[in-house]
């Protein structure tokens, strides 16, 4: 294992009376691109991107793409569709590379983009047209003189940290809300060097798996590192030799539970279809069928006002908590991974053990949650929130994945370039697996 991988391996994140979690030196991060957005003329120095000056000096690249158009400013958001057309962008700068997207993975944020919820990303970026798609594998073409992370001919994953803060953590996501970024749904694109992590030469795994890995499993890596480190600050390995880790959610949750399993935890995931329960079990994770408590969907506006709803919800919550007690021998859950949000948050907190951690990097079904701070303080519950990762975490995750086979089982069907609209329809209708992939170039 490389030094970087060792530094970031979740089992290396230890907290004792004499030492805290490992720190990442700032020098590990590509500079200065990681701390600025594309086309950001407000940042001085080598990372500066001056739109006017650049457009006069650069030649434009024209490519075929599936393009998202801006909605009408000031109007209510209306769902739209992508348009297949020619898209144009400037030649790569000195810290950028021209790339050919090969395989992409459909992500939830792509659905949010065409639904224009919670934002119209075109209007938010101040751009009439945007190319989305922020998970996948590319072939690296011409590289700028200052690029050090990849070389021409490399196969690399897209690392979708589009604009980072001073410590390298993302503020905006590439091919979503990061200004000027051009995503995977184009025959050619331009990536900054800190959006590219080269794959191991002669990798044992398919490009489809790496495409599915690039966003979800790196998200899982960063979230698990902090959640597990937080738990170990509360309870060391003598106090709690085998933590009980549960998860709501899909692919990211499954990836995170894979890390928990590798760290020696007892792992459980909740899902609601036969095929997904089978996939979970095949990964060595205990599956729990959510259909046993199908009415576990908390709605504060209906609770205690709608008698039938309240009765059904209360019964479902009771069934769920009984299931947790049975599987954990009454000890409850030490880390609960919750990528669902408001509908299950009440039940999640009730299932959490003392000194427990509830952790998330998403908000699939509700961004606003309520809790009683006094109760959480007394129980010493810790709430972890992360958003994707910083570059050195991505590098470590790739190294660990290659060494230990920690990659997702990508869907068997690969959508073709002409089938992109069908992919979006199938995804929105729930007719895909957790890792639907599509091909852009051969």
Where are these regions (language model features)?
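NAD(P)H dinucleotide-binding glycine-rich loop of Rossmann-like/cofactor-binding domains
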Residues: 160-247, 293-304
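Adenosine-nucleotide cofactor-binding segment
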Residues: 241-243, 262-343
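C-terminal hydrophobic helical "lid"/dimerization subdomain
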Residues: 61, 346-349, 391-442
């Amino acid at each position: 294992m490389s030094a970087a991988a060792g530094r970031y391996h979740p089992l290396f994140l230890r907290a004792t009376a004499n030492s805290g979690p490992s720190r990442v030196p700032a020098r590990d991060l590509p500079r200065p691109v990681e701390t600025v957005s594309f086309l950001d003329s407000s940042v001085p120095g080598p990372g500066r991107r001056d739109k006017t000056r650049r457009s006069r000096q650069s030649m434009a690249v024209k490519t075929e793409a599936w393009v998202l158009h801006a909605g009408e400013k000031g109007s209510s958001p209306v769902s739209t569709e992508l348009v297949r057309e020619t898209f144009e962008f400037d030649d790569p700068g000195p810290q950028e590379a021209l790339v050919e997207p090969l395989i992409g993975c459909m992500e939830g944020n792509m659905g949010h983009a065409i639904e224009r919820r919670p934002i119209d990303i075109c209007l938010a970026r101040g751009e009439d047209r945007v190319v989305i798609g922020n998970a996948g594998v590319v072939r690296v073409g011409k590289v700028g003189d200052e690029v050090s992370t990849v070389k021409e001919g490399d196969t690399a994953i897209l690392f979708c940290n589009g604009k980072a803060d001073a410590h390298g953590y993302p503020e905006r996501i590439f091919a979503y809300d990061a200004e000027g970024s051009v995503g995977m749904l184009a025959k050619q694109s331009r990536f900054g060097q800190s959006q590219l992590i080269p794959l191991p030469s002669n990798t044992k795994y398919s490009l489809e798996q790496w495409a599915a890995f690039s966003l979800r499993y790196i998200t899982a890596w960063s979230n698990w590192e902090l959640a597990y480190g937080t738990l170990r600050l509360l309870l060391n390995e003598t106090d709690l030799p085998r933590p009980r880790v549960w998860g709501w959610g899909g692919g990211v949750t499954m990836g995170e539970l894979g890390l928990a399993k590798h760290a020696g935890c007892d792992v459980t995931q909740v899902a609601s279809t036969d095929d997904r329960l089978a996939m979970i079990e095949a990964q060595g994770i205990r599956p729990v069928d959510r259909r046993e408590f199908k009415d576990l969907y908390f709605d504060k506006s209906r609770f205690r006002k709608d008698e039938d709803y309240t009765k059904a919800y209360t019964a479902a919550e009771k069934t769920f908590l009984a299931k947790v007690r049975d599987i954990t021998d009454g000890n409850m859950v030490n880390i609960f991974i919750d990528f669902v949000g408001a509908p299950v948050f009440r039940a999640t907190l009730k299932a959490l053990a003392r000194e427990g951690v509830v952790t998330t990097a998403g908000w699939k079904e509700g961004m606003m949650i309520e809790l009683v701070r006094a109760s959480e303080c007394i129980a010493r519950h810790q709430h972890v929130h992360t958003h994707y990762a910083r570059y050195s975490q991505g590098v470590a995750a790739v190294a660990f994945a290659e060494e230990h086979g920690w990659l997702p089982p990508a869907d068997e069907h690969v959508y073709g370039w002409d089938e992109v609209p069908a992919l979006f329809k199938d995804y929105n209708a729930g007719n895909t697996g957790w890792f639907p992939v599509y091909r852009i170039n051969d």
